[in-house]
């Protein structure tokens, strides 16, 4: 009788939060063992899904995470903020690693306003299967979050339509208060690391083509 092979080890998934700008926290979902992305990309160093929490007088969350992080990502978000205190969810595009937990977030905060391109809002209506408040934006539109109590940065998100970089519903968000451009996937690559910033270009060079 042939020996029974042991079950495969569960994938390594971890979370990291880091302050990256005034009143701004990155929520990083680290998918260490992912070996393929969008079928055609073979990955050597996993990948990372990023969301960003911006607190002014009003609060915005840019993107969520992949559904595989549901059990850990939502509690991590709740450790940072009561989801009912989030006013706006900006969806950069509806690829599953950006929008995989939108429905879960709407369960926690049904009054949340979802902000995205007209195409993204249409896609989400078919993904979450429930009514939700929404705002369709295009290049030149903006969302004023104001200045956090005790803060010095007046956060205003200006949107840039970027269809087919690399999905048809993509938008960029530029925060005039912090000077941060949230560029969706336009300048990203698949590389999983504990380092929040790519301070060593040599480390990521072999993966840059992905």
Question: Where do the language-model regions lie?
Answer:
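Accessory terminal helices/loops
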Residues: 1-11, 15-22, 177-178, 196-210
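Metallo-beta-lactamase
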Residues: 3, 8, 12, 19-22, 151-210, ...
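Active-site metal-binding motif and surrounding structural segment of the metallo-beta-lactamase
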Residues: 57, 68-115
